[in-house]
Curated annotation (Swiss-Prot):
This is Fasciclin-1. The gene is Fas1. Glycans are attached at residues 47, 368, 416, 441, 497. It is a lipid-anchor; GPI-anchor. One of its GO terms (biological process) is extracellular matrix organization. It is found in: Cell membrane. It comes from Drosophila melanogaster (Fruit fly). The lineage of its organism: Eukaryota, Metazoa, Ecdysozoa, Arthropoda, Hexapoda. GO terms for molecular function: cell adhesion molecule binding. Neural cell adhesion molecule. Keywords: Cell adhesion, Cell membrane, Glycoprotein, GPI-anchor, Lipoprotein, Membrane, Repeat, Signal.
Length: 652
């Protein structure tokens, strides 16, 4: 009887081993998972789980281990003792690690599934089911990293919530980053309950480095602390929807603060607060903070350590730019600051002298364009370009939108006679703001970074350094769309990509063509019809000077003063004009008409565009353009009429 029992027990153990072998064999046989398998083999608890229980294992690839910076990988943190398919994964699952710290599951709108900060590779999941023990393996692209206690602190809890982490941060393995200043402000404001709250939240904690300004810590009140918490939402950086504002705990009737994440092309992650509705203590505007230590899992959510507090606006525009000197490697505007200083730093002094100022600051990536390198060597030209990014006004998105209500907003810069042209499309999170300056169209990728004396808007191109041809500019600029359409159907535009010629193009803006509709309604209609493309092309040819150089407005004013007028070569003939400067604006005098220059000197890689308020159009052009036949057809009709008259006379 005893022998039979022993035999039965041996058979059961063998069956368990066989069941476990199914998943273990798949792990062992996959060479891309060998590093995790070797760790699994040496862990008795993990082996026991595979032998005896249902489970889900999240298995990092070998490539993920190569990117993993920590010395220790925690196998049990990758295992949960219940089987979950991808579809059945709940918001949290308990890991098998000591203290059972949770793993957070995020399913985003793209269909991706994340475990903490690791993405599940959907096609590689494996399921086995033997003797009722269902086991599932999901392959992930990152090693899961739990919050662990430093050696010598055995009394510190293994699975702390955000408050316990904040109180004992020095005892955890978080790269020796201090948070004492913020911790003391949380205690003084009696806001521990915010970090102690049960549930699943995102906590943002400024590090001590962010409180170098002596008065900054005193500005951290209860509302600011609320603004560092996103309640009821766990956001790991890889799973974050970029520029997707989430209501912070400081979102109420009289104060509304949102928080969102965004990522630079170099992979650096930032978080920003946007105070939409402020009060006497909390200004409206955006505050950026770099994430210095991301994705620290705690029992009630996730903690991100950030380089400065959110919501607090306590630096001038100059001080904000100077802060990138200290953050030489990864600052969002590091390159912009370097270019200013390489130019002698006088631009920074000019900015500092302004009581109200707005900066259009190109991102680090914007300076990587090859055509900028040549300009960087020319200090005078570079000074003009930098000044083109400075506005003597406090200009946020709301103010730009007000200026943009009925037309494209025109705003002067500190560069003499140079304007920027803003265009706002969409509402709310769908708002797109573009700005044109010196022939370059840029998109605002981060608006309303607030400072005590103004705003900084981060843009994706350097203004004043053209990167497109005359045709490319016409095609992309909303103010020139009518001229572009007319040139397209008449094939006039075909020549404008030629980089062997230099063009000076006087382009009527859309409102100019709309005025001709009032002055000559019949002609206006026909100018935009393909059947009359010959006439459209002839009129456009008058607006285009073709030479071996382009002519700026200053050139044309100078030539006009010297000779009384300027004669420019065009495709068929020449264009005779006089250009004058009146009160800082330019006026073209053509055939006794005065035409305002709305946007001078829009530079392109193969020429220059001057946007004018009205086309170079005469009444006699309208008579010619009013015909409904091409010249060849007109000649045929005249000949036919002459023949008919001759025949009639002969018959008589």
């Amino acid at each position: 009887m005893l022998n039979a029992a022993a035999l039965l027990l041996a058979l059961l153990c063998a069956a368990n081993a066989a069941a476990a072998a199914d998943l273990a064999d798949k792990l062992r046989d996959d060479s891309e998972l060998s590093q995790f398998y070797s760790l699994l083999e040496s862990n008795q608890i993990a082996n026991s789980t595979l032998s005896l229980r249902s489970c889900t294992i999240f298995v990092p690839t070998n490539e993920a281990f190569q990117r993993y910076k920590s010395k220790t990988a925690h196998v049990l943190y990758h295992i949960t003792t219940e089987a979950y398919t991808q579809k059945r994964l709940p918001n949290t699952v308990s890991s098998d690690m000591a203290g059972n710290p949770p793993l957070y599951i995020t399913k985003n709108s793209n269909g991706d599934i994340f475990v903490n900060n690791a993405r599940i590779i959907p096609s590689l999941s494996v399921e086995t089911n033997s003797d009722g023990k269902r086991q599932i393996m999901h392959i992930i692209d990152e090693v899961l990293e739990p919050l662990t206690v430093k050696a010598g602190h055995s009394d510190t809890p293994n699975n702390p919530n955000a408050l316990k982490f904040l109180k004992n941060a020095e005892e955890f393995n978080v790269d020796n980053i201090g948070v004492r200043t913020y911790r003391s402000q949380v205690t003084m404001a009696k806001k521990e309950s915010v970090y102690d709250a049960a549930g699943q939240h995102t906590f943002l904690v400024p590090v001590d480095e962010g409180f170098k300004l002596s008065a900054r810590s005193s500005l951290v009140d209860g509302k600011v602390i609320d603004g560092h918490v996103i309640p009821n939402t766990v956001i790991f950086t890889a799973a974050a929807q970029h520029d997707d504002p989430k209501a912070s705990a400081a979102f109420e009737d009289l104060l509304k603060v949102t928080v969102s994440f965004f990522k630079q092309k170099n992979g650096k992650m930032y978080v920003k607060s946007n105070t939409i509705v402020g009060d006497a203590k909390h200004r409206v505007g955006v505050v950026l903070a770099e994430i210095v230590k991301a994705n620290i899992p705690v029992s009630n959510g996730v903690v991100h350590l950030i380089h400065r507090p959110l919501m607090i606006i306590d630096t001038t525009v100059t001080q904000f730019l100077q802060s990138f000197k200290e953050n030489a490697e990864n600052g969002a505007l590091r390159k912009f600051y370097e270019v200013i200083m390489d130019n002698g730093g006088a631009v920074l002094d000019d900015i500092n002298s302004l009581t109200e100022v707005t900066i259009l600051a190109p991102s680090n990536e914007a300076w990587n364009s090859s055509n900028i390198n040549n300009v960087l060597r020319d200090r005078n030209k570079m000074r003009q370009i930098l000044n083109m990014h400075i506005i003597k006004d406090r200009l946020n998105v709301d103010k730009i939108r007000q200026k943009n209500a009925n037309l494209i907003a025109q705003v002067p810069t500190v560069n003499n006679n140079t304007f920027l042209y803003f265009n706002v499309r969409g509402e709310g999170s769908d708002t797109v703001i573009t700005v044109e300056g010196g022939g370059v169209n840029a998109t605002v990728i981060q608006a309303d970074v607030a400072q005590t004396n103004g705003y900084v808007h981060i843009i994706d191109h350097v203004l004043g350094v053209p990167y497109t041809t005359v045709l490319g500019k016409l095609e992309s600029d909303p103010m020139m769309s009518d001229t572009y359409k007319m040139g397209k159907f008449s094939h006039f535009n075909d020549q404008l990509n030629n980089t062997q010629r230099r063009f000076t193009y006087f382009v009527p803006r859309d409102k100019g063509w709309q005025k001709t509709e009032l002055d000559y309604p019949s002609a206006h209609k026909k100018l935009f019809m393909a059947d009359f493309s010959y006439h459209s092309k002839s009129i456009l040819e008058r607006h285009l000077a073709i030479s071996d150089k382009e002519y700026t407005m200053k050139d044309l004013v100078k030539f006009s003063q010297e000779s009384g007028s300027v004669i420019l070569p065009t495709f068929r003939d020449s264009l005779s004009i006089r250009v004058e400067e009146e009160a800082g604006r330019y006026v073209i005098i053509w055939n006794y008409k005065k035409i305002n220059v709305y946007r001078p000197d829009v530079e392109c890689t193969n020429g220059i565009i001057h946007v004018i308020d009205y086309p170079l159009l005469e009444e006699k052009d309208v008579v010619v353009a009013g015909g409904s036949y091409l010249p060849e057809s007109s000649i045929c009709i005249i000949l036919a009429n002459l023949i008919m008259i001759t025949v009639a006379k002969f018959l008589n």
